[in-house]
Amino acid sequence: MVATVKDEHPTSEIDYNKIRSSREEMMRRFKEAHDKAKAEGTITYKRIKFKSSNEPLYGVLCG
């Protein structure tokens, strides 16, 4: 019989609770910033114009 020792924090196991909590924190901070900007009236909207019909969308959003 071989005894195996389980690691305290295995590297292959994904910590979903940590991911979920950090996502919720990020969303909460964004909502706070959005509400603050909305109250101050500093949110501006800009139309996205495509230069050509075959231009990829990610190029417009990231570029």
Curated annotation (Swiss-Prot):
It comes from the Viruses. InterPro entries: DUF5486. Pfam families: DUF5486. This is Uncharacterized 7.3 kDa protein in mobB-Gp55 intergenic region.
